[in-house]
Amino acid sequence: MPLVEETSLLEDSSVTFPVVIIGNGPSGICLSYMLSGYRPYLSSEAIHPNTILNSKLEEARHLSIVDQDLEYLSEGLEGRSSNPVAVLFDTLLHPDADFGYDYPSVLHWKLEQHHYIPHVVLGKGPPGGAWHNMEGSMLTISFGSWMELPGLKFKDWVSSKRRSLKGDRVMPEEIARYYKHYVKVMGLQKNFRENTYITSVSRLYRDQDDDDIQDRDISTKHLQIEKSNFIKRNWEIRGYQRIADGSHVPFCLFAENVALATGTLDSPAHLEIEGEDFPFVFHSMPEFGAAINKGKLRGKVDPVLIVGSGLTAADAVLCAYNSNIPVIHVFRRRVTDPSLIFKQLPKKLYPEYHKVYHMMCTQSYSVDSNLLSDYTSFPEHRVLSFKSDMKCVLQSVSGLKKIFKLSAAVVLIGSHPNLSFLKDQGCYLGHKSSQPITCKGNPVEIDTYTYECIKEANLFALGPLVGDNFVRFLKGGALGVTRCLATRQKKKHLFVERGGGDGIA
């Protein structure tokens, strides 16, 4: 039974949860699934192609993966995540996927309701998070099967909708619908609250040396979940919920643990240059796509400036190119830079992105020629400023400056999470505490097996916040957090059963 009413968070401002999850994208959904008692076991007929890992799995076949030593299981595994549990869980769900194989998962899932840990998932929109806001005309970078969550194959869901997959990659809107349906079919709705906006998350008291040092004002205010199990108010979460009539109703919750699953798409990164706030400068694909769809750029002679060398910038290039809008494409790297994402994508699977990369290499600007009619790339260039007359100033790596008249500009150089509800915007949680949190450059620093923040006990982070930008890998975060919380819950039960303390946390 949910701890608060389905329609509202605010009826009882004294409610305390063992876990509050902030963010209802795939990270938050997967964590809710596992906290609800779903447990992964090695399938009876399964043989993992990695013989060493398979031997380890056989040693404890009777135990769920949640109850096993994740450090031991993940030792020696390699993959496209810096977090070992993410690599482990991915290789269990998609064995040898990076070698081009489509082996079935070696896991099967059981619902064990006695493992349920009460929690609430707070999100701004419907379950699926930012996937509901992505440009619908572009294909996902990952295969549909890599976007799926445990227990419901994406292809099976598509078949149930009487639709067929035209290829392995799918539209973001399909993925968004899948995530929303997943929450419903898995019976997770009671844990989710939509239209919620967090304004502050603050610690009420701190532990010292892992002993319970309590704030005397709040030490007796706890919610009893079971007869012998009390939870502590480590965190206060404040915010508001937007209700049907558009009004905002404030709420206040308390939690023993908070899990940050916000993703990193909230705040587009800026160049921080003169004129960047002019209305002709966009910072997201939805903005740019809307301008094209509304015909604002139709028939324009002046080119669109696109800044960035990632896949979102490539999407913008394709969007403009396919709409017959000339493009100036500016990026700071060399086209031969081995870290360019295009070099990591097979040509057969991603022909449209390799088309962009081919243009980046072969249609670059030179001082001896004018702009090409459809597309011109400017490798190793940066934008110095935007002018009110819709001009921009570019500078090459050698210092040469050029001025161009534009019809619009799109700056797509990454994004930052909105962690304004944390002290110092959450910067103190990162590897570089003086810089904003980013997926690649400065992720949240965590224990890589529990996903607990190094700088803050009882605060967890998963998904893009810790560098796992692909859905394939963020599921490992849910496994790490669930194992950590389940282990602590067992210790708490054991402590009470043996007569330790007075039962008040």
Curated annotation (Swiss-Prot):
Which Gene3D superfamilies does UniProt cross-reference here?
FAD/NAD(P)-binding domain (3.50.50.60)
Location(s) in or outside the cell: Midbody
For activity, the cofactor(s) needed are: NADPH
Lineage per the UniProt record: Eukaryota, Metazoa, Chordata, Craniata, Vertebrata
Q: Which UniProt keywords apply?
A: FAD, Flavoprotein, Meiosis, Monooxygenase, NADP, Oxidoreductase
GO MF, one example:
growth factor activity
InterPro entries to which the protein is assigned, alphabetical = FAD/NAD-bd_sf (IPR036188), OKL38_fam (IPR029731)
Q: How is the cofactor bound?
A: No monooxygenase catalytic activity in the absence of NADPH.
Q: Which GO terms describe its biological process?
A: meiotic cell cycle; negative regulation of cell growth
Major subcellular location class? other
Function according to Swiss-Prot or TrEMBL: Monooxygenase catalytic activity. May be involved in meiosis or the maturation of germ cells.
Tissue and organ distribution: Ubiquitous. Expressed at higher levels in testis and ovary.
Transmembrane intervals = none
The molecule here is called: Oxidative stress-induced growth inhibitor 2
* Superkingdom per UniProt: Eukaryota
To which protein family does this belong?
Belongs to the OKL38 family.
